[in-house]
Amino acid sequence: MQYSEIMIRYGELSTKGKNRMRFINKLRNNISDVLSIYPQVKVTADRDRAHAYLNGADYTAVAESLKQVFGIQNFSPVYKVEKSVEVLKSAVQEIMRDIYKEGMTFKISSKRSDHNFELDSRELNQTLGGAVFEAIPNVQVQMKSPDINLQVEIREEAAYLSYETIRGAGGLPVGTSGKGMLMLSGGIDSPVAGYLALKRGVDIEAVHFASPPYTSPGALKKAQDLTRKLTKFGGNIQFIEVPFTEIQEEIKAKAPEAYLMTLTRRFMMRITDRIREVRNGLVIINGESLGQVASQTLESMKAINAVTNTPIIRPVVTMDKLEIIDIAQEIDTFDISIQPFEDCCTIFAPDRPKTNPKIKNAEQYEARMDVEGLVERAVAGIMITEITPQAEKDEVDDLIDNLL
């Protein structure tokens, strides 16, 4: 027998009261986006559960994708059969023969939304249990915590059988907590920060700063690939490429070396905040971890934060590097993050960055530059690409292929 659909149960949505259907509709759309790589799969949702109809798609692959989607508590693969007692008896016998191993216990759990069906739930449990005994005479029934709980549901259109429950990712559906702008470099930390924001329902847009010719097409592609890895948790993500060469050259020419990193981060924060305002975001998210590098001190964060009143979320701020790496490996971003392409934060990095920069000094050095003009030109030059779970070969891929 082949699975016909996957029955999906919701996570924290049960606590959302009058907003429940808004959360459910968002989750349905997210599931549809993530499963868009399987065109034949169709997704529906109601107040109690969602259904992914396989229509011939490979169950194992679809299930692996579903495991990542935030907002799902658990799900079960389901067999759809004709709504008749004889067909049901034959189906439970076939299923039990496939999965039963010596010494296992079982029970039948039936329920029906079609109350015109010829047997009630108790009678159906007894009838189907008897069919199992016919197929496997020595099998034992156990009502509490059996090895196999074969669930049977009688609906108006058909009967459905399942025996397996698979844990989902939990969390909230992406997009139900508002939008945030993720400052995405090419490193290990920022994709993990994005992942943790997604888990709490934040719809992220990835802001990446590129400084050609100092940063390569490979660095840009790396950031896009990291973004694509994050789409599996809630669907498509807008990737915003910011031209940053002019600003970095200006900082390099007009500021002392010790303040290069501080000023660079202040400009990045200004630009990200301007993009957030235009695109109706609520927060800025980054991958800073306290004390991990010389520029990520509380004094440095204070100096960088000073250019905006927008809330800054730093999901990994209290984590050790090894904790962050563990998550990066779990979400499959680590191997991409360690590819040897330099990003904006490393190309002009000073040997001894200021660990306790003063806001007054930063403002004094910025007074030598046309800050507003630099920010406006950078924002005017952004390029936005929608990143989907399905990778498409693009010009950067072709360029890298030629270089290799």
UniProtKB/Swiss-Prot annotation:
GO terms for cellular component: cytosol. Gene3D superfamilies: 3.30.2130.30, HUPs. ATP binds at M183, L184, H208, F209, R265, G287, Q296. It catalyses: [ThiI sulfur-carrier protein]-S-sulfanyl-L-cysteine + a uridine in tRNA + 2 reduced [2Fe-2S]-[ferredoxin] + ATP + H(+) = [ThiI sulfur-carrier protein]-L-cysteine + a 4-thiouridine in tRNA + 2 oxidized [2Fe-2S]-[ferredoxin] + AMP + diphosphate; [ThiS sulfur-carrier protein]-C-terminal Gly-Gly-AMP + S-sulfanyl-L-cysteinyl-[cysteine desulfurase] + AH2 = [ThiS sulfur-carrier protein]-C-terminal-Gly-aminoethanethioate + L-cysteinyl-[cysteine desulfurase] + A + AMP + 2 H(+). One of its GO terms (molecular function) is CCA tRNA nucleotidyltransferase activity. Its EC number is 2.8.1.4. GO terms for biological process: thiamine biosynthetic process; thiamine diphosphate biosynthetic process; thiazole biosynthetic process; tRNA 4-thiouridine biosynthesis. The keyword Nucleotide-binding applies. Pathway: Cofactor biosynthesis; thiamine diphosphate biosynthesis. InterPro entries: Rossmann-like_a/b/a_fold, ThiI_AANH, ThiI_fer, ThiI_N, THUMP_dom, THUMP_ThiI, tRNA_STrfase, tRNA_sulfurtransferase_ThiI. Keywords: ATP-binding, Cytoplasm, Nucleotide-binding, RNA-binding, Thiamine biosynthesis, Transferase, tRNA-binding. NCBIfam families: tRNA uracil 4-sulfurtransferase ThiI. This is Probable tRNA sulfurtransferase. It comes from Streptococcus pneumoniae (strain 70585). The gene is thiI.
